[in-house]
């Protein structure tokens, strides 16, 4: 049985046509959260057989396989350490939105991560936006002041 819930209801199967979802995990003890995405299926190219290789140019086929979404608990190392230490029962696993293309899932994830300022807010486990790592990015008072100036300018 999956630990995911959508609008309070348990999710055991993906909605028809959905590519993936954006989720929020919440630590029920300290209320820290994590916003991420998960695809329902993985896709890879099927290796060509020797016969196909020797035949010359052959179009490769793609294989779709269900991902580990039912058991998935996020990709943040700090989050996963907390889940191991505190127990999965101390976290809620909530699907926020479904996307019906890869682009929709990615857009939803990054949009929500920016909207909730997950990199600068200590209430979030996130250390990246989308798949981009901000390795050299440190949140300083100067950076926050610059962001406030831009925010004020844009209204």
Provide a role label for each language-model segment.
Residues 1-155:
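Structure-specific nucleic-acid interaction/processing domains
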């Amino acid at each position: 049985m999956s630990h995911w819930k959508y609008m309070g209801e348990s999710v055991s199967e993906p909605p028809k046509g959905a590519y993936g979802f954006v989720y929020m995990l919440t630590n029920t003890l300290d209320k820290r959260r994590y916003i991420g995405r998960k695809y329902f299926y993985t896709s890879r190219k099927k290796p060509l057989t020797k016969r196909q290789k020797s035949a010359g140019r052959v179009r490769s086929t793609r294989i779709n396989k269900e991902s580990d979404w039912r058991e998935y608990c996020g990709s943040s190392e700090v989050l996963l350490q907390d889940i191991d230490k505190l127990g999965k029962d101390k976290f809620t696993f909530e699907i926020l939105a479904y996307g019906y293309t890869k682009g929709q899932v990615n857009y939803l994830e990054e949009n929500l991560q920016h909207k909730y300022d997950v990199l600068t807010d200590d209430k979030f486990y996130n250390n990246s936006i989308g798949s981009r790592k901000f390795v050299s990015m440190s949140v300083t008072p100067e950076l926050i002041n610059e962001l406030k100036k831009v925010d004020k300018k844009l209204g």
